[in-house]
């Protein structure tokens, strides 16, 4: 397996977080986790996470839910079209060709279904940016779709709470950051979960991808991929090469987003990545994005004085990838 110390790395690093879930783990074991995660995030910005404690049956159920949804006829999926979401809540079905991540590329081929924390329709904040009730397909029973999905969503939030504690411990000592420096971002956060489907693309186009070359907008992303499918690639700047990220059994792929890079003044890297289309095989995945509390003002931790409001940053990035009439319909 490749490592970041290699001139030409062949894979992203692996971090076993289990010592942080074990009350009897030694101080040395926890320190090794901090070092491994710090090194991965300050070089590549990506790593495999193992020892996370999420049961395999829970992970498989989410992939099953993903397949159930995308097996629906188009008219059923369009009943939950994202343009029907309350206000600017940005929930529901994302048809193919909705996003363009880079000038000169054709729109992404992926289909998506986006959901987040449930906010009642009568709540004062419902309908504001990234906040509101989820749209659930009437043709799928709750016990086969919404219930397992929201149970999994809650587990993702708890897992990221552990990850950001490790990230805080890995910050430069001279910054004198408190150990709870990232805790605020997980309080009432924007935390979308996207179910994604990449249909086979018999005709390969050089300027079209499942997801084009991009960086994630938020703080921490957690990707669940179906075994037996390929496509994700990460850009490694020192060698100017794309490194494949194949599915590793029982693991998640974790990456830092733009907001984390801003917050840490570039110490933790938000890496470019893309999904290359497969000619013959369908691909399913379920990325979870911890954007953070949308009202949180993040002061650059190196003391440089830069301040970024999470919600303003996320909205601006969405406007860059979903423009024109589609953006207007979605309240961007």
Where are these regions (language model features)?
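Peripheral, non-catalytic segments flanking oxidoreductase cores
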Residues: 1-332
């Amino acid at each position: 397996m490749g490592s970041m110390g290699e001139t030409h790395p062949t894979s992203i690093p692996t971090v076993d977080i289990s010592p942080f879930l074990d009350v009897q783990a030694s101080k040395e074991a926890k320190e090794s986790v901090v070092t491994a995660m710090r090194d991965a995030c300050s070089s590549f910005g990506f790593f495999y996470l193992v020892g996370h404690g999420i049961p395999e049956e829970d992970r498989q159920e989410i992939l099953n839910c993903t397949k159930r949804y995308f097996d629906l006829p188009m008219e059923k999926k369009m009943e939950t079209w994202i343009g029907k979401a309350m206000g600017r809540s940005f929930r529901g079905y994302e048809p193919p060709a909705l996003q363009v991540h880079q000038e000169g590329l054709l729109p992404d081929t992926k289909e998506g279904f986006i959901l987040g924390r449930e906010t009642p329709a009568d709540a004062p904040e419902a309908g504001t940016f990234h906040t509101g009730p989820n749209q659930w397909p009437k043709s799928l029973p709750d016990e086969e779709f919404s219930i397992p999905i929201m149970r999994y969503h809650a587990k993702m939030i708890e897992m990221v709470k552990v990850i950001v504690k490790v990230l805080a411990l890995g910050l430069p000592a001279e910054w004198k950051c408190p150990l709870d420096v990232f805790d605020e971002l997980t309080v009432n956060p924007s935390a979308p979960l996207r179910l994604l489907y990449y249909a086979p693309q018999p005709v390969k186009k050089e300027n079209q991808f499942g997801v084009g070359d991009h960086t994630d907008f938020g703080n921490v992303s957690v990707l669940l991929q179906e075994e037996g499918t390929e496509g994700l690639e990460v850009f490694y700047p020192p060698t100017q090469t794309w490194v494949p990220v194949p599915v590793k059994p029982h693991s998640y792929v974790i990456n830092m987003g733009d907001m984390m890079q801003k917050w840490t003044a570039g110490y933790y890297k938000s890496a470019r990545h893309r999904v290359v289309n497969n000619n013959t095989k369908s691909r399913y995945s379920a990325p979870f994005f911890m954007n953070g509390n949308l009202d949180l003002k993040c002061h650059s931790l190196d003391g440089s004085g830069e301040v970024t409001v999470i919600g303003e940053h996320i909205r601006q990035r969405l406007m860059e990838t979903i423009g024109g009439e589609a953006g207007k319909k979605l309240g961007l």
